[in-house]
Design a protein with these regions (language model features):
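FIC/Doc superfamily catalytic core
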Residues: 4-6, 19-479
């Protein structure tokens, strides 16, 4: 009788030789497997049958990190990585998923206190009327900050200036810019859905994913749930992978289970968002874009629960700045140490809220300086309205101003001219037609904010570079 290899190795260790089942082509396993950080050798005796000849061959394979579901990389095909090993094949383990629908809602006193503190910070951010009004004015730019940070976790580097230019002129953008714009669209979709107070469905998850890839060269994979094994890290095979998600035949069942858990209202909204995100990362239902969709679900859960009706703090900024702790937290969740992961997430939310409050204060101060520079324009003037618009639309042209402020061509022209002469706007096209301007000071402020949250907290070293100070304006094509 074969040993049961479907159980999860809760400590993160791959099964030992004694635990592995016998297969027709793996008669004996002589070595032992490994843990998640070190790779040991597996030696297999098996019969290799070829036409007109049969022989028994001993080959040395390695075990790829993972746990739970034993799988075989068949090999026999050219490989961009892994060399002879990938061509010969090897044994690896996919994570054996576990349901969360009925996860207990009770937590330790220490975690309950951290969750309460995080929830209070989110409420304070949304309930303070003056601050909320300001955050709503800049929410679009901060959502882009969240998208930049979330995309940076996936390896896409883009400055706030470049993203603003891409949003202004989507047709003339780099592939990285389009990818980050897709992340903004995905978060927009999550927020739109949450505002309708509907329960999360697999269909909506696919819609968010589809929005992520709209307008990119990978648009064809948008919304398509995978039908084969995937892995995180490594290259074109599981060798060297940091984590191997659940097998493809578990994806649909676990997504349905995740949606049922997301519909619950009997536990902390912060804990619920943390668990939904970690479980989605563990399922990894798509061939690409899972992390960005998973972080969009944080917004969806917190808005749906009513904790953050106006503004979700930029949690991805904190997770990206402390990426090592983020990865460790996801690993502990997969080992069913749910409390440790929820604590990491709750602390990230608390820091993000406080950082967002600091950013709001700095933007308030910047707008006050702009008004002073512009000579204190009347509240109903195009110049005053334009100052309020700049945090949301830092790159603009005449048509943008006319549409956003509902003013005439002449009023828009005079408003732009007044702010340009005051040093608040700077032209970035240098053309007579198709002229565009950007706000002076906002990008430096946003970069400063990112450097602030990238500062180590609690002894943790940020795993990404803090953004460099803003340099001279770049040029963009005429619209």
């Amino acid at each position: 009788m074969e040993p049961d290899c479907s159980k999860r190795a809760r400590s993160g260790w791959v099964r030992t030789a004694a635990d592995l089942p016998t297969r027709p082509f793996t008669d004996r396993i002589l070595g032992v497997a490994t843990n998640l950080s070190k790779v040991s050798v597996l030696t297999l005796d098996y019969a290799e049958v070829k036409p007109r000849m049969a022989r028994t061959t001993k080959r040395t394979y390695r075990a790829v990190p993972g746990s739970g579901v034993r799988r075989i990389w068949a090999g026999g095909q050219p490989s961009l990585s892994g060399g002879r090993l990938a061509r010969q094949g090897f044994v690896y383990y996919a994570f054996d998923g576990w349901p969360i629908r009925d996860l207990a809602r009770s937590f330790s006193a220490e975690l309950a206190q951290e969750l309460t503190e995080a929830e209070n910070e989110v409420r304070r951010l949304n309930d303070d009327p003056p601050r909320t009004q300001l955050l709503e004015a800049v929410a679009r730019q901060l959502l882009r900050s969240e998208a930049v940070a979330s995309s940076r976790i996936e390896g896409f580097e883009l400055s706030h200036r470049k993203l603003a230019e891409a949003a202004f002129d989507p047709e003339d953008t780099s592939l990285n810019a389009r990818a980050v714009l897709g992340n903004v669209r995905a978060m927009d979709e999550a927020i739109r859905f949450a505002s309708e107070q509907l329960d999360l469905t697999v269909t909506e998850i696919r819609t968010i994913h589809r929005r992520l890839f709209e307008g990119t060269r990978d648009a064809a994979i948008g919304g398509v749930i995978r039908n084969s094994q995937n892995w995180i890290g490594g290259r074109d095979n599981p060798w060297g992978a940091r984590f191997i998600p659940v097998p493809e035949d578990q994806v649909t069942r676990l997504l349905d289970d995740l949606c049922r858990f997301a519909a619950r209202d009997d536990l902390s909204a912060i804990a619920q968002a943390a668990i939904v995100h970690a479980q989605f990362e563990t399922i990894h239902p798509f061939s690409d874009g899972n992390g960005r969709v998973g972080r969009s679900l944080i917004h969806l859960v917190l808005r749906r629960r009513g904790l953050a009706p106006y503004y979700v703090p930029p949690v991805s900024l904190i997770l990206a700045a402390n990426y090592e702790e983020y990865e460790r937290g996801l690993t502990t969740f997969r080992e069913e140490q749910v409390e440790e992961w929820c604590g990491i997430f709750a602390r990230a939310v608390t820091i993000a809220c406080r950082g967002a409050g600091e950013l709001a204060t700095r933007i308030e101060e910047l707008k006050a300086r702009w008004r002073e520079q512009a000579g204190s324009p009347r509240a109903d003037s195009a110049a005053a309205k334009l100052i309020d618009l700049l945090p949301v639309q830092p790159v603009l042209d005449m048509r943008t101003v006319q549409d956003a402020l509902d003013v005439s061509d002449e009023a828009a022209r005079l408003g732009i001219a007044r702010l340009e002469s005051a040093g608040i706007l700077s032209e970035i096209t240098k053309r007579k037609r198709g002229r565009a301007w950007e706000s002076v000071g906002l990008f430096a402020l946003l970069d400063s904010f990112e450097r602030l949250v990238a500062t180590p907290t609690g002894g943790s070293t940020p795993m990404r570079r803090a953004p460099r100070p803003t340099r001279r304006p770049s040029k963009i094509a005429a619209r």
